[in-house]
């Protein structure tokens, strides 16, 4: 399916560009997106990948990943029946889903790539996506969001009266998109057109063949001593105290930290944080997102060290894979983003808007949302620009702006996710993953419009 979509984007871009006199824009779009794929996405991702793969190595060697997978075994076994309950992929997928829920994009992508690498160890047809890979991608493109931070930030920057009004609508919409994605991927995996034929592996070019990934079960770590348990309890209590102090008494927390900051850095001025004025539930979610990364970066090495793991050596061993993964995804990123850039430069998005507007307007779908909805599966940065322009033009408190913010927070750049995740393990036959991801996006869009009409009118 991905072959036909890619060919359609490229061919239509050339035809539309030739018919409308925009071939120069088509060429510029191709070159700009090729440069972006390498210089602004793949290479910066290498450092982030190295960090989180190193941290995941510590979690794996200390036995934390296995414990997390065991705790969620009943749910994960139903979603991924082809993956053994004690397989490392279970823990990697759980970590990725948790990061997505908290809006930790810098952590979610490396953890998701690690999960794909673990799932590849179970793949009997290299180059072809397994059912577990397709299910994981469908969940990833529709993951439940507790706090759509980017959409809220854009609404707040345009002086919305209540920029956090979309938190509830985005949460409900992501539930709908997740359910739709899971149902779609499970229903389509046995369709004849998507079924994997026994022994039929996709042809994989030697230049992109993934390295063999042995299933490494870490040795049993040393038992946690009593004083080690006390140290972990103290560490957790410290973060719990920070969390509740900021959530329950944010003004006192900011005053105390500002006083300490002035004592240590007397020449700097501390600006008051905006979270103090937010409602308590939003402060709780915001503080959870803020503390999550520092907690993980501190807890995993501490736990591993207390269980006898050589933390520096194991971190470096895990981080070694980061650059290799970034290199492997470059051809797939270039292919997808170049096609998107050409189609957008040719005016294909505007043409689709003109064709679909007469059909969707009678159904209560605002035509102003169409460009953003059409671009969303293709490009995150372009969607951000379109959303910002829409908010500026219609007002941040308009119904359409709130619909757009809800859509932004409940959908995903499906083709980018496919290129990065499948590219990391050289999967060329995506099977039903694309269709399931787009169905999840469509469900998120429809749910966003309906929920916003019910809540804001």
Per-segment meaning from a language model:
Residues 1-13, 59-69, 134, 139, ...:
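Alpha-helical transmembrane segments of integral membrane proteins, especially early/N-terminal helices
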Residues 1-41, 199-327, 454-457:
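Hydrophobic transmembrane alpha-helices of multi-pass small-molecule transporters
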Residues 24-120, 307-392:
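Membrane-embedded alpha-helical segments and adjacent helix-loop junctions characteristic
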Residues 18-28, 59-64, 147-162, 243-257, ...:
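Transmembrane helix-loop junctions in multi-pass membrane proteins
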Residues 6-19, 49-57, 142, 149-153, ...:
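Hydrophobic core segments of alpha-helical transmembrane domains in multi-pass membrane transport
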Residues 119-235, 397-457:
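Membrane-core helix-loop-helix motifs of multi-pass transport proteins
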Residues 110-131, 167, 171, 252-264, ...:
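Hydrophobic alpha-helical transmembrane segments and immediately flanking/interface helices
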């Amino acid at each position: 399916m991905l072959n036909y979509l890619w060919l359609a984007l490229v061919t239509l871009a050339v035809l539309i560009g030739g018919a409308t006199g925009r071939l120069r824009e088509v060429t510029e779009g191709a070159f700009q997106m090729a440069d972006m794929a390498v210089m602004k996405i793949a290479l910066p991702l290498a450092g982030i990948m190295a960090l989180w793969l190193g941290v995941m190595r510590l979690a794996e060697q200390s036995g934390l990943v296995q414990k997390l997978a065991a705790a969620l075994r009943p749910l994960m076994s139903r979603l991924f029946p082809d993956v053994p309950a004690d397989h490392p992929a279970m823990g990697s997928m759980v970590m990725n889903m948790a990061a997505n829920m908290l809006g930790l994009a810098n952590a979610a992508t490396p953890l998701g790539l690690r999960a794909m690498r673990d799932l590849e160890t179970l793949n009997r047809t290299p180059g072809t996506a397994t059912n577990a890979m397709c299910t994981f991608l469908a969940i990833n493109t529709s993951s439940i969001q507790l706090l759509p931070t980017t959409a809220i930030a854009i609404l707040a920057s345009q002086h919305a009266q209540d920029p956090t009004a979309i938190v509830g609508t985005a949460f409900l919409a992501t539930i709908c998109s997740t359910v739709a994605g899971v149902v779609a991927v499970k229903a389509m995996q046995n369709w004849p057109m998507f079924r994997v034929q026994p022994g039929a592996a996709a042809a994989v070019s030697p230049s992109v063949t993934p390295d063999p990934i042995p299933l490494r079960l870490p040795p049993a770590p040393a038992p946690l001593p009593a004083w080690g348990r006390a140290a972990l309890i103290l560490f957790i209590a410290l973060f719990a105290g920070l969390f509740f102090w900021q959530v329950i008494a944010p003004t006192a927390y900011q005053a105390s930290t500002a006083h300490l900051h002035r004592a240590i850095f007397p020449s700097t001025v501390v600006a008051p944080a905006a979270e103090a004025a937010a409602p308590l539930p939003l402060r709780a979610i915001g503080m959870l997102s803020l503390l999550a990364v520092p907690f993980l970066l501190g807890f995993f090495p501490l736990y591993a060290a207390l269980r006898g793991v050589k933390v520096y050596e194991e971190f470096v061993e895990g981080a070694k894979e980061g650059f290799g993964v970034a290199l492997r995804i470059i051809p797939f990123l270039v292919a997808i983003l170049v096609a998107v850039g050409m189609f957008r430069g040719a005016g294909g998005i505007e043409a689709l808007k003109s064709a679909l507007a007469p059909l969707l307007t009678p159904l209560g779908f605002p035509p102003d949302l169409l460009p953003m909805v059409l671009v969303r599966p293709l490009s995150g940065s372009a969607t951000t620009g379109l959303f910002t322009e829409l908010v500026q033009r219609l007002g941040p408190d308009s119904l359409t702006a709130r619909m757009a913010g809800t859509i932004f927070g409940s959908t995903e750049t499906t083709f980018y996710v496919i290129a990065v995740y499948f590219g990391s393990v050289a999967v060329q036959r995506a099977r039903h993953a694309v269709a399931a991801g787009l169905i999840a996006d469509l469900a998120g869009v429809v749910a966003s419009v309906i929920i916003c009409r019910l809540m804001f009118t």
